[in-house]
């Protein structure tokens, strides 16, 4: 019998040692797999590992959903996902366990445009914020701190997007390793401080997706693990190498980047900036494309006519993604599995390690970074220790917090450590200041030499004290009017919204006085003008009506005067003649209901403003007024109808006469004015003055369904029919003929506010061509 050779014995010894090592390590390996999923679940060790790379591109990212739908139909397994920007959002949601059809259905049920651009449902805002967007439609807010003015780091804070992503990934704790997801996932972001690429592979999945798509200048940067991050497209918009580093054998890369525009299409600084970003991103995309190998697959859906912000065209993007896969089906077929093998793959990639249903919150940690006390944040949270974690319920609480206007962002994270689930609420105040300035512009002209211009400036200083005291100032400087209003608002019971507001204000208004032709004609001219001054100081008690509006009740002391500036009767040389002076203590009730969906071009909702003021005490001339105006809007498709009504009058005083050159004031009341755009549009501003007023308007708006028209965003074509009149005597109120006017116009939002251009006509040959900047109701 031959004896084994020495080399054979060495082989047997090594083989035995290897088996012993396997037996020793096997329990540890089994324990490790139960603690965390391996990078690639072992459904079929013989097939190549496939990585999916999804690029950024905003709304064009809907194409990724179409790609995923087709890959599922072809039974192509995905073992790892690397994504950037919108690709990180779609990829992260898919990796978390949302299949393509479920993802498409979820996105179809939300308005991603409103969510991505942080458009809040206006009806749910506090009344103070609704007041501001009425007065300052530009929407620009500058902060002031440390002796300098600052602007927000982004036009959009991204709070609604983050909340949505958190709700859709709520089954995963916020300190998870992304390798534990059903499909291992990585997102790419850019460190704003260094310019380096950052791979996000652990922590909050929602936060990682939000950070990856923080387009500089548009979305505010976001802090993750102490680093300020922005969109990953700046460094790697198509992260092929990242997928390769995750251990895949084959890459399916989907590039949805925007195409370069022709030079003649670059008609604005914003367009040039976008072109520059597209060029820079395109350079890193080309570098990543160069890393693709022969067996890799590159998909580039045809997305002509679909821009970064065209979220409304999502279905078009989905179809483009499906078509791109269909065109590459021959190559992808080699990667597909049998039905049985694909079912095993899906089973292996079911969510494991997610939060169990009914997970209870063991502790709540709230942090703030400014003057708003932690107790205020806790007060507005409905969740308590011991409650079952409900991401959507908590998002509703955080949404209510963010709409207060005090915070830049309010985020939630549920982290698990040693079996203890801690809910962390981070409320960050606005980083661009502790005082804020608001801006607005107004202008009107009918191209005949008459016109007016004004600048609006607002100042807000919230949380002067821990009790929530706010200082509010509003200034109007214009050719025909000037005013200043200063007010302190002190909350009494913050949980109920009550407040007390001492205030002081001064207003000066100049209006032309017209010859009282009945009916008025095109030749009706102003023969003098009137300057009205009002000074008032008082204190109001404010009470909210839920989120529908508020009531203010108060007392004040008011002083009024009117001065005539005669022109025509003095050969054109103005002669000022004080005519009317009065002062009195008064009580006032002010009701505001505001449920319009938009303050400028409402498509739905209603608005009501009612003001009643009456004098008291021993005064020579007591003046009492009541005024109300309302607007109701409704829409069907692209068609919108608005109905506006207004009424005003004096009560409890002697009926005024018309002895003052056409001015209706009785020595105390300045009367009410009618005329001007959308206030009898064919006539001059404030052409009609009386002690009593009635007015109504029906307006039709047609959405032109284009993104931009002559610099106007969301332009509309409009037509209006108007009727109204003023009366001097109470007994004549509502009687006689009504003045009528009709108009046709084009309007839309411009960078400096709402803009209208149109034509108006009335009987007796009266007509106007007008250009109006600023709010009209």
Residue spans for each PLM region:
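Patatin-like phospholipase
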Residues: 2, 28-84, 92-399, 403-410, ...
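Gram-negative/organellar outer-membrane beta-barrel architecture
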Residues: 391-397, 409-588, 669-681, 686-690, ...
């Amino acid at each position: 019998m031959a004896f084994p050779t020495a080399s054979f014995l060495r082989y047997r010894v090594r083989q035995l040692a290897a088996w012993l090592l396997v037996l020793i390590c096997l329990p540890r390996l089994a324990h490790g797999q139960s603690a965390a999923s391996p990078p690639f679940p072992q459904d079929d060790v013989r097939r190549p590992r496939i990585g999916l790379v999804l690029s950024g591109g905003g709304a064009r990212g809907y194409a990724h959903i179409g790609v995923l739908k087709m890959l599922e139909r072809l039974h192509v397994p995905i073992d790892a996902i690397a994504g950037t920007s919108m690709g990180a959002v779609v990829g992260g949601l898919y990796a978390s366990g949302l299949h393509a059809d479920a993802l498409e259905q979820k996105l179809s049920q939300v308005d991603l445009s409103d969510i991505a651009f942080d458009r809040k449902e206006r009806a749910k805002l506090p009344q103070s914020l609704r007041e501001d967007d009425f007065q300052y439609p530009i929407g620009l807010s500058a902060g002031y701190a440390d002796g300098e003015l600052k602007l927000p780091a982004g036009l959009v804070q991204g709070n609604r997007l983050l909340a949505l992503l958190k709700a859709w990934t709520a089954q995963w704790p916020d300190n998870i390793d992304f390798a534990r997801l059903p499909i291992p996932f990585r997102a790419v972001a850019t460190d704003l401080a260094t310019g380096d690429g950052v791979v996000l592979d652990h922590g909050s999945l929602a936060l990682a997706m939000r950070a990856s798509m923080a387009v500089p200048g548009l979305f505010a940067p976001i802090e993750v693990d102490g680093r300020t991050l922005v969109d990953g497209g700046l460094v790697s918009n198509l992260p092929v190498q990242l997928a390769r580093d995750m251990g895949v054998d084959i890459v399916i890369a989907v590039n949805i980047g925007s195409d370069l525009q022709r030079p003649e299409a670059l008609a604005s600084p914003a367009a040039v900036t976008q072109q520059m970003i597209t060029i820079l991103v395109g350079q890193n995309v080309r570098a990543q494309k160069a890393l693709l190998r022969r067996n890799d697959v590159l998909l580039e859906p045809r997305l002509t006519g679909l821009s970064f912000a065209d979220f409304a065209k999502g279905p078009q993007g989905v179809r483009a993604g499906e078509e791109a896969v269909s065109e590459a089906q021959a190559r992808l077929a080699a990667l597909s599995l049998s039905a049985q093998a694909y079912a095993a793959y899906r089973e292996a990639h079911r969510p494991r390690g997610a939060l169990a249903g009914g997970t209870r919150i063991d502790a709540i940690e709230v942090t703030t970074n400014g003057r708003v006390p932690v107790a205020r944040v806790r007060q507005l949270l409905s969740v308590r220790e011991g409650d079952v974690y409900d991401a959507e319920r908590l998002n509703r609480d955080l949404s209510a917090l963010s709409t207060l206007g005090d915070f830049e962002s309010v985020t939630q994270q549920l982290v698990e450590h040693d079996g203890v689930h801690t809910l962390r609420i981070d409320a960050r105040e606005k980083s661009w200041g502790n005082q804020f300035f608001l801006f607005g512009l107004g202008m009107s002209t009918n191209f005949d030499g008459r016109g007016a211009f004004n600048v609006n400036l607002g100042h807000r200083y919230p949380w002067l004290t821990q009790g929530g005291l706010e200082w509010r100032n509003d200034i109007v400087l214009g050719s025909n009017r000037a005013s200043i209003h200063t007010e302190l608002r002190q909350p009494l019971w913050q949980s109920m919204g009550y407040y007390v507001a001492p205030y002081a204000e001064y207003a000066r208004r100049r209006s032309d006085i017209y010859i009282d032709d009945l009916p008025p004609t095109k030749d009706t001219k102003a023969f003098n003008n009137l300057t009205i001054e009002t000074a008032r100081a008082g204190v109001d008690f404010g009470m909210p009506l839920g989120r529908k509006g508020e009531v203010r009740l108060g007392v004040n002391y008011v002083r009024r005067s009117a001065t005539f500036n005669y022109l025509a009767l003095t050969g054109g040389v103005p002669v000022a003649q004080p005519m009317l002076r009065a002062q009195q203590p008064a009580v006032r009730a002010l009701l505001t209901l505001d449920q319009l969906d938009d303050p400028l071009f409402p498509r739905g909702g209603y608005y009501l403003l009612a003001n009643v003021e009456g004098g008291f005490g021993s005064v020579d001339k007591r003046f009492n007024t009541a005024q109300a105006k309302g607007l109701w809007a409704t829409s069907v498709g692209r068609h919108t109808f608005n109905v506006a009504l207004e009424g005003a009058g004096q009560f409890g005083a002697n009926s005024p006469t018309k002895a003052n050159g056409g001015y209706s004031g009785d020595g105390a009341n300045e009367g009410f004015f009618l005329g001007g755009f959308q206030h009898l549009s064919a006539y001059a501003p404030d052409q009609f003055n009386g002690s009593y007023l009635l007015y109504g308007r029906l307006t039709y708006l047609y959405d032109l369904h284009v993104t931009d028209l002559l610099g106007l965003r969301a332009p509309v074509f409009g037509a209006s029919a108007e009727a109204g009149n003023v009366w001097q005597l109470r007994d004549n109120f509502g009687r006689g003929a009504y003045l009528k006017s009709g108009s046709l116009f084009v309007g839309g939002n411009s960078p400096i506010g709402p803009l209208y251009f149109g034509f108006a006509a009335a009987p007796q040959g009266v007509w106007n061509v007008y250009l109006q900047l600023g709010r009209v109701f």
